[in-house]
UniProtKB/Swiss-Prot annotation:
Transmembrane helix in keyword set: yes
Organism: Escherichia coli (strain K12)
GO molecular function: transmembrane transporter activity
GO cellular component, one term: plasma membrane
UniProt record similarity statement: Belongs to the major facilitator superfamily.
Entry-linked CDD domains: MFS_NepI_like
Protein name: Inner membrane transport protein YnfM
All ranges on the Cytoplasmic side of the membrane: 60-73, 123-125, 174-190, 263-264, 337-364, 409-417
Keywords on record: Cell inner membrane, Cell membrane, Membrane, Transmembrane, Transmembrane helix, Transport
Periplasmic topology ranges: 1-38, 95-101, 147-152, 212-241, 286-315, 386-387
Superkingdom of source: Bacteria
Positions of region (Disordered): 1-22
Transmembrane segments: 39-59, 74-94, 102-122, 126-146, 153-173, 191-211, 242-262, 265-285, 316-336, 365-385, 388-408
């Protein structure tokens, strides 16, 4: 007698057998399949953002070791997010053609290997090349994970599952910053990045093992004409271009604050250590709560109001960082992080329902704008820091958030007119 197994070769449970016999059934919350998807994508998000942002708290160290200005040092992060943004234009359509899981697994493995190789680079240009390859590789996870959830999870639970995925992103960003900051203080930055690379490699292997294969994936053509038609369709939508703008502004604000807050706090009167700068990433923990919470709140209040409220929380948190009290600054960072991850969770969960087809490409365009904001605003923030100090950086971030509120208001009115 043949033995029914799951996609990873493990014996299938009764629930798995039922799902296999009904291939069109969406995965619902509370089922073993939902737990596997949640754990797999949580670990993928964690590894992705640990790899991407591990250099952020050590920017002052890189400035000292390689004789760089803050703006030039920030390129080690900006080049990763820029290449990630460019890669999204290709990996989303690629996943539409060959499948979600193969693209994500390959991307995580390549990014982990490039991170380990970056610890062997002796020149700044060598480090930048590795960081560019890391960003390009991670583009295969960022948008495809969102698309996988929108395809495989029951529509009633997509916002909740997206919130859990984003919470994995927040923990990953926190872990990468925390490990690199503390390990750099006690050892050096090369050992710190090597530890993160090994951690991400283990996460990639676990992700490959437990993520179920796509059941609702239908391959589409990679012909340039088809890609252009879908691109035009997305940009003609009443809501998608505004969501793309939201991603640019939200991420640009978030990265700018965390890029330069460390420079500020290492100066007088605080003089905090590199380890403490890394510990500031604990502010990300609020994102692990606010992301799924925002997802559940959308069912009661709607996506527009929740996104606007979350953006307002970011603005209030930013204002608190303008004070000199270290406790007020950290409290402001907590609020800022909570608001960001909530707003991003809502915006990203809005993409799938709005896209009429080629959802992978739509998610890629959103995250292209998202990471483009990180690259452009993250580097421009260094100019404001150099010329105007933290007040200048705060004014720059506040301007982006006010524009985000205006865009969000227009989006809500347009889709509910």
């Amino acid at each position: 007698m043949s033995r029914t197994t799951t996609v990873d070769g493990a014996p299938a449970s009764d629930t798995d057998k039922q799902s296999i016999s009904q291939p069109n059934q969406f995965i619902k919350r509370g089922t073993p399949q939902f737990m596997r998807v949640t754990l797999a994508l949580f670990s993928a998000g964690l590894a992705t953002f640990a790899l991407l942002y591990c250099v952020q708290p050590i920017l002052p160290v890189l400035s000292q070791e390689f004789g760089l200005t803050p703006a030039n040092s920030s390129i080690s992060l900006s080049i990763s997010t820029a290449m990630l943004a460019i890669g999204l234009l290709f990996t989303g359509p690629l996943s539409d053609a060959i499948g979600r899981k193969p693209v994500m697994v390959t991307a995580l493995l390549l990014a982990s290997i490039c991170t380990l190789l970056s610890t062997m680079m002796t020149s700044w240009h060598g480090i930048l090349i590795m960081r560019a390859l890391i960003g390009l590789s991670l583009s295969g996870v960022a948008a495809v994970g969102m698309t996988y959830l929108s395809e495989e999870i029951h529509p009633s639970f997509v916002a909740f599952s997206m919130g859990l995925y984003i919470s994995g992103n927040s923990i990953g960003g926190m872990s990468g910053r925390l490990i690199s900051g503390v390990f750099t203080d006690f050892f050096n930055w090369r050992i710190a990045l090597a530890a993160i690379g090994c951690f991400a490699l283990a996460s990639a292997l676990m992700f490959w093992k437990i993520l179920p294969e796509s059941r609702h994936f239908r391959p589409t053509s990679l012909r340039p004409k088809t890609l252009f038609i879908n691109f035009r369709l997305h940009w003609r939508d009443r809501g998608l271009p505004l969501l793309f703008a939201e991603g640019f502004l939200l991420m640009g604000s978030f990265v700018t604050l965390f890029n330069y807050i460390g420079y500020r706090l290492m100066l007088s009167p605080w003089h905090v250590s590199q380890a403490v700068v890394g510990l500031l990433s604990l502010a990300y923990l609020t994102g692990t709560w606010s992301s799924p919470k925002a997802g559940t709140m959308t069912t009661r209040y709607g996506r527009g109001p929740v996104m606007l409220f979350s953006t307002g929380v970011m603005l209030f948190g930013l204002l608190m960082t303008l004070f000199s009290s270290l406790w007020l600054i950290f409290a402001g960072m907590l609020l800022f992080s909570a608001g960001f991850f909530a707003a991003h969770s809502v915006a990203s969960s809005w993409i799938g329902p709005r896209a009429k087809r080629a959802k992978g490409q739509a998610s890629s365009l959103y995250l292209f704008s998202y990471y483009l904001g990180s690259s452009i605003a993250g580097t421009l923030g260094g100019v404001f820091w150099h010329n105007y100090g933290w007040n200048g950086v705060g004014a720059f971030i506040a301007l982006m958030l006010v524009i985000a509120l205006l865009v969000g208001t227009r989006l809500h009115r347009r889709l509910h007119a």
